[in-house]
Curated annotation (Swiss-Prot):
UniProt GO BP: one-carbon metabolic process; S-adenosylmethionine biosynthetic process
Protein name: S-adenosylmethionine synthase
Function: Catalyzes the formation of S-adenosylmethionine (AdoMet) from methionine and ATP. The overall synthetic reaction is composed of two sequential steps, AdoMet formation and the subsequent tripolyphosphate hydrolysis which occurs prior to release of AdoMet from the enzyme.
UniProt: Mg(2+) binding residues: D18
One GO MF term: ATP binding
Region feature (Flexible loop): 100-110
Organism: Crocosphaera subtropica (strain ATCC 51142 / BH68)
Enzyme superclass (EC): transferase
Binding-site residues, L-methionine: E57, Q100, D260, K291
EC number of this enzyme: 2.5.1.6
Gene that specifies this protein: metK
Length: 416
């Protein structure tokens, strides 16, 4: 008997309060690594009405004007009018940054393996910046090997921001959220149940002053300018039963940091797989590559995507775990949920052979320290909104499938 169910994922725009914080945090990462690629950074940001607080720990040779950096990013996002409750030029920016704890630094600078004379391998030099568990996922639901619900939700959010920025829908304001419920039948996406868009907007639109008229105009415009263009090249289309909800509270004029406080690292499911895969709990933004919450999660995605791209599984989840100050992973797990084409133990052996999963190895393989300088001073801030994975609009090293053929070759050698 077939099983029919719904799965829902959400996304938020770059103007969402939490995403403002993520982007400022990662702009700090970009700037510090651009000037000093050995920078150690844990940058947290809080925003509220008229206020930005930058706090955390930074050890770097770079000299950065954090106040100016934050204002520029806020303006780029679109908060330039104080009448909207938050503006780049008028908000207060407070900076309270300390140096990285020497107790933590010693374990990162010289890993347990070298301190105990267990190894002289260069890649054993850097210890994990913290303990923790990280997950990565890939599946064959979309060309970018991402789950369809989060893929569509991000596309709607990016399109929503685009029509605001181009002026096509000039009455839109920066804050917004999207949500998509996909119909599955026996694990395969077959339809769209609900599309939800909540978007901040002007009080009136042209000559339309009553709220009912404003909401009707927004709903019609979003269907034509956001939903239809996104779905144009998607195989699954809305049906007559598909619900399209816009601003279900009835109004969304007060938004951004005036409507809700924002904090770095509060959109970890939006950043990853939309709840479709497990999550270790660690956020990405504001962390330099020695923090395995970030770098190892990227490595997990890299491994999982190459396994699926190689045709070795239809779905794959990879888990890594680390101990603070220790270079080598505590554990590595490869799970294919019954869709694997080869023995999972042999697949795990191939992963261990082909992928370097020590922090220094991940940093080196994915070039995580040099990316900001190679990309003109901005890299991490661009993945801080609209997802860190499955980004066809960005050239992300962990999205490469260069190991797929090598995985198949390695498994052929052992007779799989």
């Amino acid at each position: 008997m077939s099983r029919r169910y719904l799965f829902t994922s959400e996304s938020v725009t770059e103007g969402h309060p939490d995403k403002i914080c993520d982007q400022i945090s990662d702009t700090i990462i970009d700037t510090l690594l651009y000037h000093d690629d050995q920078s150690r950074v844990a940058a947290e940001v809080v925003v509220n009405t008229g206020l930005v607080l930058i706090t955390g720990e930074v050890t770097s040779k770079a000299n950065v004007n954090f106040v100016e950096l934050a204002r520029k990013k806020i303006a780029e996002i679109g908060y330039t009018n104080a009448d909207n409750g938050f503006s780049a030029n008028s908000c207060a920016v407070l900076v309270a940054l300390d140096e990285q704890s020497p107790d933590i630094a010693q374990g990162v600078t010289q890993a347990h393996e070298q301190r105990q004379a267990l190894s002289d391998d260069e890649l054993d030099q850097i210890g994990a910046g913290d303990q923790g568990i990280m997950f990565g996922y890939a599946c064959n639901e979309t060309p970018e090997l991402m789950p369809l619900p989060i893929s569509l939700a991000h596309r709607f959010s990016r399109r929503l921001a685009a029509v605001r920025k181009t002026g096509d829908l000039g009455y839109l304001r920066p804050d917004g959220k999207t949500q998509v419920s996909i119909v599955y039948e026996d694990g395969i996406p077959v339809g769209i149940d609900t599309i939800l868009i909540s978007t901040q907007h002007d009080e009136t639109i042209d000559s339309i002053t009553d709220n009912d008229g404003v909401q009707a105009k927004i709903k019609s415009d979003l269907w034509d300018a956001v939903v239809l263009p996104v779905l144009d090249n998607i195989g699954i289309k809305p049906s007559q039963e598909t619900r399209f909800l816009v601003n279900p509270t009835g109004k969304f004029v007060i938004g951004g940091p005036q409507g809700d406080a924002g904090l770095t690292g509060r959109k970890i499911i939006v950043d990853t797989y939309g709840g479709y895969s497990r999550h270790g709990g660690g956020a990405f933004s504001g962390k330099d590559p020695t923090k395995v919450d970030r770098s190892a999660a990227y490595a997990c995605r890299y491994v999982a995507k190459n396994i699926v791209a190689a045709g070795l599984a239809e779905k794959c989840e990879v888990q890594l775990s680390y101990a603070i100050g220790v270079a080598r992973p505590v554990s590595i797990l490869v799970e294919t949920f019954g869709t694997g084409k080869v023995d999972e133990n042999k697949l795990l052996d191939a992963v261990k052979e082909l992928f370097e999963l020590r922090p220094a190895g991940i940093i080196q393989a994915l070039n995580l320290r040099q990316l900001p300088s190679q990309r003109g001073g901005r890299f991490y801030q661009d993945v801080a909104a609209y997802g860190h994975f499955g980004r066809n609009d960005l050239d992300l090293p962990w999205e490469a499938t260069d190991k797929a053929a090598l995985l198949k070759e390695a498994l052929l050698k052992v007779g799989v």
